[in-house]
Swiss-Prot record:
The protein's name in its UniProt record: DNA helicase/primase complex-associated protein
One family name in Pfam for this protein: Herpes_HEPA
InterPro entries: HSV_HEPA
BP GO terms, sorted: DNA replication; viral genome replication
Subunit structure: Associates with the primase and the helicase to form the helicase-primase complex. Interacts with the origin-binding protein. Interacts with the polymerase catalytic subunit.
GO annotation, cellular component aspect: host cell nucleus
Biological role stated in the UniProt entry: Component of the helicase/primase complex. Unwinds the DNA at the replication forks and generates single-stranded DNA for both leading and lagging strand synthesis. The primase synthesizes short RNA primers on the lagging strand that the polymerase presumably elongates using dNTPs. The primase-associated factor has no known catalytic activity in the complex and may serve to facilitate the formation of the replisome by directly interacting with the origin-binding protein and the polymerase.
Top-level taxon: Viruses
Signal peptide range: none
Keyword NAD: no
Annotated localization: Host nucleus
Keywords assigned: DNA replication, Host nucleus
Length: 873
């Protein structure tokens, strides 16, 4: 096969089929005409191998006001100005972003086509191969051509290290310095306002199997990374830079923003040193330029001429592929998220011919994001955060028919990425039955394909590595809300239409649905009808297929439905954001671009079935910092079967369920061996509660359950990944740290004083981590579930006390839990010879003692656990 000659050696216009990978602002030339660079991937058309080119595109002439906005000041100058207030600085950043984004997305008719990155286009260049003259969406391109071409390219993995000056507080506080201290929301912005900088930089690029290390001005190394070409355009000399073999640059989410910006500034100086023509724009917008931080997203409008983004951790970075990069960029729906709403594309929805009138499906549209959680509120109960909670009985659940009017939507704007505050809300569901997680696998992807044209979102790229198609689609839909309201509302309405009919059908068929997430994930119990048992999976599949055909018609079957896993019926919503329960899965590395989608976490083996079931309930349980296991107690009064004794004596605390001396490695399905974080350990233990509480338990048996959590914590006490949490910028008190880290969602651990310690995955665990804070919160979750179980047992057993004819004789002095044929747990009353009043008194005493015993057990085990952590710190 004859190699294709370079474009700049040709003397006639040439047509190329390929895709735009990135648009960047080069500069303003004569008559205020903006020039945009386009990194273009030529697919080769079967004549040659795919190849990267850099072209220029003319934009429409800018008005004088926008020209002044571009030339006035850089992002850094606008963000660090001490003569303006915070609102004025923010408006300055937004105004500059709006001008740059308008040119990069809508600067001309050609730019509007090329701004749809990683979608097939056809272009025509001038004879010199410099300027794109025409561009249009490509028709008839093989669906796998783009994926095959991208598989031949790489992502450059960039790691930058350096040194920082010591930060000294000023002895004399000036008025400006006082304003900085009052206004900053993160350590990062405070440092920026005080002139923080980095020096002694060293950077490493890994492209495929090759690694390039730059510590000085090594032009030979740069020549292997970037191809430089000087061209003359509109009587101006330009230097076009094209990456060699890679289509994007990725960094870890722990990369310091200041080091990253400094690295690209250094490379810019080397590549354009001694250049007499006009260099491209050099600017940077990142989360460190905002007072309260922002998403971990980077916008380099001019140089480098490739997209730059962050992934979660060094291990993920080393496995990043060009297909992952394409998925990441596609999910932006325009420019990186840090640019804001001005950086998103306008996407027109498809005109649909549906079998349902508009007013029937449009009513289900909501502003909630794709990861929003919808709870079945028929059994919601709220309890006050303060007061004597042990004896406060909640009101009975509301009963409004099928319960479809009793739904609470939980916002998920952060994706559950960060832990709530100490005074968070626990929303608890407990039921002694097998709960199924039913997944509509490809619902979101197929609805998006129906509503958005392929030229706006390419559905044919194979997302099979870091990012799943669902994660890309979900973030793309989220970004439609800013400038494509009609498309966003259409998609959300159709998804809500199907989701709401699934839960309505479950309720009508006698199935208890507990929670739905993102329109595609449902937590449902099997049920019974007059004809026999009803399968949750079959019910959901039938409803989805029925309403899919009703909407779109034809013989095309609906999206695929399956039971992803099953576990005992325990779910806890923490702070309206994170789900904790006995489910053994995580949401991938997360989603595009942002933080991981921390969804349901837990560690229970799928398929475990509880037996008889107690009336299910979702109860709001408020947790204050002093509740649950306090983490502080008198060591002399700790349990004799405590952690230290269990380590060597084999004392079992009187429990034949879980011996307190059982080492963590011997615990069935232990998350210590399977991985997962501390919430996984808690979720695993929560899954054992329904089976444990079917009959009366002693204090020592309750202590054994709390001690199981403690054992798991002790076994992973030095494991960094086990304790890491993801925190949002500006929402917590963060300890001072080197670099610029806390300006975006960052990983950290709790300290005993309630502060947040910035913690890297690749360094040793902080010596002063607050183990007691984790123990306190974990024990509070367990105690909340026990209390909910006790009160639901009390509520569900009321009906069984009205008659003696259906009662059974107790085998012990106190009532025990038995299974009823209706699938709910009841407390068997004493025989007719016993006094009903006496039995009620015994029952109430037992139920109240269960909650009190759980609180006492939590305090005793927390006391011995804290003693161990102090001695072994």
């Amino acid at each position: 096969m004859t190699a294709q000659p370079p474009l700049h050696h040709r003397h006639h216009p040439y047509t190329l089929f390929g895709t735009s990978c990135h648009l960047s602002w080069y500069g303003l030339l004569e008559a205020s005409v903006p020039i945009v660079q386009c990194l273009f991937l030529d697919l080769g058309g079967g004549r040659a191998e795919p190849r990267l080119h850099t072209f220029v595109v003319r934009g429409d002439r800018l008005p004088p006001a926008e020209v002044r906005a571009v030339h006035r000041a850089s992002y850094a100058a606008l963000a660090s100005a001490v003569t303006t207030d915070a609102d004025e600085r923010r408006r300055g950043l937004e105004q500059r972003s709006a001008v740059l984004a308008r040119v990069l997305l809508e600067g001309s008719a050609l730019i509007r086509v090329l701004a749809r990155t990683f979608t097939p286009v056809q272009i025509q260049t001038d004879a010199s191969g410099v300027e794109i003259l025409e561009a249009a969406p490509a028709l008839g391109v093989e669906t796998t051509a783009l994926s095959n071409a991208l598989s031949l390219f790489h992502v450059a993995k960039l790691v930058v290290i350096g040194s920082y000056p010591e930060v000294h507080e000023p002895r004399v506080v000036t008025h400006a310095a006082e304003r900085v201290s009052e206004e900053y929301g993160t350590h990062a912005h405070k440092k920026l306002r005080r002139g923080y900088y980095a020096y002694d930089l060293a950077m490493s690029f890994r492209v495929g199997t090759h690694k390039y290390v730059l510590e000085r001005d090594d032009e030979a190394v740069l020549a292997r990374l970037f191809e430089v070409r000087e061209v003359c355009f509109l009587r101006t000399c330009l230097r076009l830079v094209t990456p060699v073999g890679f289509v994007a640059v990725a960094v870890t989410d722990e990369q310091c923003c200041l080091l990253l910006q400094s690295a690209w500034t250094h490379l810019y100086d080397v590549l354009f040193r001694g250049f007499a023509g006009q260099p491209p724009l050099r600017d940077y917008l990142g989360p460190d330029l905002f007072e309260t931080g922002a998403a971990r997203s980077f916008f380099f409008p001019g140089f480098p001429p490739v997209p730059v983004y962050a992934v979660h951790g060094l291990h993920t970075l080393m496995r990043e592929t060009a297909l992952d990069a394409a998925a990441e960029v596609l999910s932006w729906c325009g420019l990186p998220d840090i640019v804001g709403s001005a950086g998103k594309l306008e996407v027109e929805p498809c005109a649909l011919s549906l079998g349902v009138p508009e007013d029937e499906w449009q009513v289900f549209g909501t502003e909630a994001g794709g990861g929003a959680v919808r709870l079945n509120a028929t059994a919601f109960r709220e309890r006050p955060a303060g007061g004597d909670r042990r004896w406060l009985l909640p009101p009975l659940p509301r009963d409004d028919g099928d319960g479809e009017n009793n739904v609470v939507e939980v916002s998920s704007s952060t994706g559950g990425a960060h832990p709530p505050s100490d005074d968070a809300t626990f929303t608890v569901h407990v039921r002694d039955a097998t709960l199924h997680r039913v997944l509509i696998v490809d619902l979101v992807e197929r609805v998006l394909a129906k509503c958005v044209r392929a030229r706006d979102f390419n559905p044919y790229v194979r997302y099979s590595h870091r990012l799943h198609t669902y994660a890309v689609c979900e973030k793309f839909i989220e970004n439609l809300r800013f400038r494509s309201r009609r498309a966003f509302w259409q998609i959300q309405s159709l998804l809500g239409y199907i989701s709401e009919h699934v839960t309505s059908a479950c309720a009508s068929a006698g199935l208890l649905w507990v929670l739905s997430r993102g329109h595609r994930e449902f937590y449902v119990y099997d049920g019974y009808s007059g004809h026999g048992p009803v399968s949750a999976e079959v019910c959901v599949r039938t409803v989805v297929d029925c309403y899919w055909r009703k909407l779109f018609g034809g013989d095309d079957p609906g999206p695929t439905c399956r039971v992803q896993e099953s576990a005992p019926g325990v779910l806890l919503v923490w702070g309206d954001e994170r789900l904790v329960g006995p489910f053994n899965f995580f949401y991938g590395n997360g989603g595009a671009g942002g933080s991981p989608l921390h969804g349901v976490v837990g560690g229970f083996a799928a398929g475990h079935c509880g037996g008889a079931c107690c009336a299910g309930c979702v109860v709001t349980h408020r947790h204050s910092s002093g509740g649950g296991g306090s983490g502080v107690g008198d060591a002399d009064h700790a349990s004799g079967g405590g952690l230290d004794a269990a380590a060597g004596s084999g004392h079992n605390g009187g429990s034949d369920r879980v011996s307190p001396s059982t080492p963590p490695a011997a615990l069935g399905g232990c998350c210590c061996a399977a991985g997962g974080d501390w919430l996984s350990a808690v979720g695993h233990v929560l899954g054992r509660l329904p089976a444990l509480l079917r009959e009366r338990v002693s204090v020592s048996e309750l202590e054994a359950v709390y001690r199981e959590i403690l054992f798991r914590f002790v076994a992973r006490r030095n494991d960094v990944d086990f304790w890491l949490l993801r925190f949002q910028p500006g929402e917590n008190e963060v300890r001072p740290h080197a670099g610029v880290i806390d300006c975006a969602p960052f990983h950290g651990v709790w300290a005993e004083q309630g502060q947040i310690i910035v913690q890297s995955r690749d360094t040793a665990l902080a010596a002063d981590i607050g183990y007691g804070v984790y123990v306190d919160k974990a024990f509070a979750m367990l105690t909340a579930c026990v209390e909910v179980w006790a009160r639901e047992l009390l509520s569900s057993s009321t009906a069984s006390t009205t008659t003696c004819s259906s009662s059974s004789v107790l085998s012990s002095a106190l009532p025990s839990v038995t299974s009823s044929s209706s699938g709910t747990a009841t407390v068997s009353p004493p025989s007719c010879s016993s006094s009903s009043a006496t039995w009620l008194e015994e029952r109430d005493e037992w139920v109240r003692s269960l909650a009190v015993d759980a609180q006492h057990a939590a305090k005793r085990v927390a006391s011995e656990g804290l003693r161990f952590f102090r001695l072994n710190a």
